[in-house]
């Protein structure tokens, strides 16, 4: 048993020690009041929406009292209007800064080609994917863990590919339309509309927020080559973090401009997106987005020249890791096999090809994919 009075964040930090062997509740210097400007919110009983910070609650206090640490009784917090809110110690621990630093937001399995192939991740049959929550959940679990997933036995048309894509998300309309459909006809000012090989890259880095998920479906190929290249960018970045943390840190700090200028036929676009190559959550340094595209990277003029030189050294280290053959997963896309790619994580490319090759696909809104996963009980 221990007496306690303090601010809400202090209580949350103290709750991390709930259930320790000596049965004590370490308060870590609690002050007795919620600090000025702290937000204590009340949720609507039906909608769950928080109505914003209640004015005047900067003076709310955590009652001094005794709690049995063994059963983790709720901690009461009294507002100046007399309203009392009770917080469970488990909830306080989970939502404290110290608690968040220890948690992974998105559990993942980082992979190279050998790791992925040995995992023998199954594809999902189209009908099971479309008609059952179990099939959908299995697909999303694979997608969240590995950043790629396949649906088999899809009717090879743009219309049926759209039905499959909309199973997990709203389609994100971009300058390429909703469902894009392309061959090597140079109809757009993009290297994808050629027969040339494409190096590994993130798509739409020139958007302020790159598209979250990309869908590919090869409808027809009468020729040779054209295999799809997939590389886990997070695995490569983690190798850089382990071998040269100063490179990782620099790539996560220096903002870059990516630019796309198109003047082909009736398509006139000038897109610019700005952001670091590696994006991390500031509280736990967890990587959540890689923005790697040497085709669309613009002039680096956002930092002093000495930093630019250091950045190129760091970029060279990451590029070397991304281009290691052991990190390259090559997949031959065929009619009936749709590929979903986490564009924030997995880089994709293509080998050169001959003959007539026809692909369709789209971009999906990331928020809706993650929402679908959470509604099925997955951590996303």
Identify the meaning behind each predicted range.
Residues 96-98, 105-148, 153-340, 344-380:
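Active-site environment of non-heme Fe oxygenases that use a 2-His-1-carboxylate facial triad
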Residues 2-141:
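Fe(II)/2-oxoglutarate
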């Amino acid at each position: 048993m221990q007496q306690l009075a303090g601010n809400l964040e202090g209580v949350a930090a103290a709750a991390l020690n709930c259930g320790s062997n000596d049965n004590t509740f370490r308060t870590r210097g609690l002050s007795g009041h919620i600090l000025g400007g702290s937000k204590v919110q009340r949720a609507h009983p039906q909608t769950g929406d928080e109505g914003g910070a209640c004015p005047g609650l900067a003076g709310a206090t955590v009652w001094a009292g005794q709690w049995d640490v063994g059963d983790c009784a709720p901690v009461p917090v009294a507002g100046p209007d007399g309203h009392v809110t009770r917080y469970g110690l488990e909830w306080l621990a989970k939502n404290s800064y110290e608690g968040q630093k220890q948690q992974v937001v998105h559990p993942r399995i980082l992979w190279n080609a050998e790791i992925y192939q040995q995992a023998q991740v199954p594809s999902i049959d189209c009908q099971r994917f479309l008609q059952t929550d179990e099939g959908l959940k299995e697909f999303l679990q694979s997608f969240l863990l590995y950043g790629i997933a396949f649906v088999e036995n899809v009717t090879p048309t743009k219309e049926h590919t759209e039905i499959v894509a909309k199973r997990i998300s709203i389609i994100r309309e971009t300058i390429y339309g909703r469902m894009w459909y392309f061959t090597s006809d140079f109809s757009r000012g993009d290297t994808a509309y050629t027969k040339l090989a494409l190096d590994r890259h993130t798509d739409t880095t020139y958007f302020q927020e790159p598209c979250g998920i990309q869908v590919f479906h090869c409808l027809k190929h009468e020729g040779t080559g054209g295999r799809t290249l997939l590389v886990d960018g997070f695995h490569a970045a983690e190798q850089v973090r382990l071998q040269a943390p100063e490179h990782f840190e620099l790539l996560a700090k220096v903002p870059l401009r990516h630019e796309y200028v198109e003047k082909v036929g009736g398509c006139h676009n000038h897109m610019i997106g700005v952001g670091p190559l590696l994006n991390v959550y500031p509280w736990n340094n967890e990587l959540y987005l890689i923005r790697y595209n040497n085709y669309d990277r613009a002039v680096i003029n956002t930092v002093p020249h000495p930093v630019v030189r250091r950045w190129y050294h760091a970029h060279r280290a990451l590029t070397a890791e991304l281009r290691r053959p052991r990190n390259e997963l090559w997949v031959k896309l065929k009619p009936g096999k749709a590929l979903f790619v986490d564009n924030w994580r997995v880089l994709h490319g293509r080998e050169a090809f001959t003959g007539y090759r026809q692909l369709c696909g789209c971009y999906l809104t990331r928020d809706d994919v993650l929402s679908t996963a959470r509604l099925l009980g997955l951590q996303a």
